[in-house]
């Protein structure tokens, strides 16, 4: 059995984030084999992770890896924004997006499986639930990306043009959040909903007006709605005198697609109730 030195305990502590006594105990049990000790601690980390699995992870970070021809967007969630700013979390996210890009993954499932051991160590170390939520890979003639403060990530695929142009359009997408690429992609249902809302809001204004005037008012609103909802019709944020579609055409490009991730989209955040939390802690203490 190898000697359990202070240096060995320190190394295990740095690699796992566990307490000194826990590290010494794990090394003793593993006969001084640090890798075996880590494996054993993963098992205990998995127990801790299971306890955290019910906690809502709605904060986190977006990461991007690209090479001008392909890009991967990745969202990794944490429970608090504080953890998302810590080096351990950042390292996990960076390693995950690098692997996803290198392995040309198009879905999160294989990445989740590959990174599970590292995730469990991170959960055990930080005490927070951490999840790889989603991943997207895009490829094309020209690919440009934009990352806004690790909270919003965008990848734009162009046919023709330049990476710089694609990056400019990606920055616009981050700021303006279009729902569609083209007006023709807006569903009839979405148009009808917009029409119904417009009629409801302007009911008084339309009273007594001829039908043709009402139709023109509706057509004007729908036209504005299509321009607001579709990327190519939006005014470019850097130069509102030109649309994004015209900008692309001027740069000799056609916009093929855009992908936009924002941290926590669609996740219902848990609102903590302090009284309920205290009651739950007291109930748990009684059961121990």
UniProtKB/Swiss-Prot annotation:
Under SUPFAM superfamilies, the record lists: Elongation factor Ts (EF-Ts), dimerisation domain, UBA-like
Provide the GO MF annotations for this entry: translation elongation factor activity
NCBIfam families from the UniProt entry:
tsf
List the CDD domains.
Answer: UBA_EF-Ts
Compartment(s) of residence? Cytoplasm
Protein name per the record: Elongation factor Ts
Please give the family membership noted in the entry.
Answer: Belongs to the EF-Ts family.
Function of the molecule: Associates with the EF-Tu.GDP complex and induces the exchange of GDP to GTP. It remains bound to the aminoacyl-tRNA.EF-Tu.GTP complex up to the GTP hydrolysis stage on the ribosome.
Alphabetical UniProt keywords: Cytoplasm, Elongation factor, Protein biosynthesis
Instruction: Name any GO cellular component annotation.
Output: cytoplasm
Q: Matching Pfam families, A to Z?
A: EF_TS
What is the name of the gene encoding this protein?
Answer: tsf
Region listing for Involved in Mg(2+) ion dislocation from EF-Tu, in residue ranges: 80-83
């Amino acid at each position: 059995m190898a000697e359990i030195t202070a240096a060995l305990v320190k190394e295990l502590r740095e690699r796992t984030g566990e307490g000194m006594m826990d590290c010494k105990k794990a090394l003793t049990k593993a006969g001084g084999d640090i890798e075996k000790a880590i494996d054993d601690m993963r098992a205990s980390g998995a127990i801790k992770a299971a306890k955290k699995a019910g906690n809502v992870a709605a904060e986190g970070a977006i990461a991007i890896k690209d090479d001008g021809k392909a890009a991967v967007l990745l969202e990794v969630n944490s429970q608090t924004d504080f953890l998302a700013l810590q080096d351990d979390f950042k390292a996990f996210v960076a390693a995950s997006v690098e692997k996803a890009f290198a392995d040309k993954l198009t879905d999160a499932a294989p990445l989740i499986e590959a990174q599970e051991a590292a995730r469990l160590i991170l959960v055990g170390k930080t005490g927070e639930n951490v999840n790889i939520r989603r991943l997207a890979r895009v490829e094309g003639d020209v690919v440009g990306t934009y990352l806004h403060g690790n909270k919003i990530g965008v990848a734009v695929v162009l046919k023709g043009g330049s990476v710089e142009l694609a990056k400019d359009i990606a920055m616009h997408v981050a700021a303006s959040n279009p729902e569609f690429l083209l007006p023709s992609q807006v569903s009839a249902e979405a148009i009808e909903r917009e029409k119904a809302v417009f009629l409801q809001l302007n009911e008084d204004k339309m009273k007594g007006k001829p039908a043709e005037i009402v139709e023109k008012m509706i057509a004007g609103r729908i036209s504005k709605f299509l321009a607001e909802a579709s990327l190519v019709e939006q005014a470019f944020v850097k130069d509102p005198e030109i649309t994004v579609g015209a900008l692309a055409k001027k740069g000799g490009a056609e916009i093929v697609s855009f992908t936009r991730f924002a941290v926590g989209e669609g996740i219902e955040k848990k609102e903590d109730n302090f009284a309920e939390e205290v009651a739950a802690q007291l109930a748990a203490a009684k059961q121990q």
